[in-house]
Amino acid sequence: MSTESGAHEDDGGKKGVSVLSKHTRADIDRWLLKYPPEHKRSAVLPALSAAQHQNNGYLTVELMDAVAEYLELEPIAVYEVASFYSMYELEPVGRHSISVCTNISCMLCGADDVVRHIEDKLGIKIGESTPDGRFFLKEEEECLAACCAAPMMMVDHVYYENLTLEKVDEILDSLE
């Protein structure tokens, strides 16, 4: 049932919505409060992020369908968003997601060395997870908007800037 603001009080008996945890639905509802009720579509990005977080870092068709139902959208509208943005994963990935910026500023400051170092240290290539499921080295990021602090990477949505190979080792070694 929707409130006047467009947020949901419960799942309203919608079968797919029950796939979303109570916490995920509450997170989506907080975002829905920021938009007019007729613009629920505006909450699709944070809704997908919440669903992905609920599922250990990746989205399933079932979760995307539940998000579509919760936001009263056609499933294809949600699939298009999830498959377009690099922040969403559609297959299982490692617990810690590593994104190295590979745009011009970072590349000129050694991002290619950082990527090679991470690949060698973890024994994986870009787009792969470690066999123990601990790390996932995302496809190259085009730009993470921290050009003045290049090279940089993002690990689990936290920025690490002015990287050296030693600093990369410290960061990765600190993650369980």
Give residue spans per PLM region:
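Signature of N-terminal electron-transfer/Fe-S-associated modules in redox systems
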Residues: 2-176
